[in-house]
């Protein structure tokens, strides 16, 4: 089991320092502490597939948006039924989220969304894009822009292309990548202290 991932460990250290100087409120410090504690309790993955730790990072990172979602929020798991990798990852993610994954003040409830039907997705607060959708990622970009909702994924290439707002990796260390243009299109902005700890494209 790993210790607290470095990005969130650094966030907590920053929060502690700023809290002593009165420059940051207790809520932000509490969020940082919750992230570090939650992720430290998740075992390291034994394979390259999406992991519970990846999902925890995604969920916690959504809490650092300027207008973070709270309460029960449907997260659309976007997948391509004709792609075995995408379909398997969607099934795995649905199982990991179960009846609802709690992260701080947020509980994510999975909703399966076929990529060709993403434009008609109903009450969804965010999208979780699976790997293997390829060029169809452009449909996600269009949906996040029209619906003004964030997209998260472990497929960093989709973030680099602008199809998805945020990508995460939890091993060998936590890394978070945000596409600034995609975030702006989706109406998503992040807390300044969080932005110092991520990579923006």
Give names to the regions the model predicted:
Residues 30-41:
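Bacterial N-terminal signal peptides
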Residues 13-16, 39, 44:
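Intrinsic disorder/low-complexity segments in short proteins, especially the signal peptide
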Residues 1-25:
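N-terminal secretory signal peptides that target proteins for export/translocation
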Residues 2, 8, 43-201:
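Short hydrophobic alpha-helices and adjacent helix-cap/hinge residues
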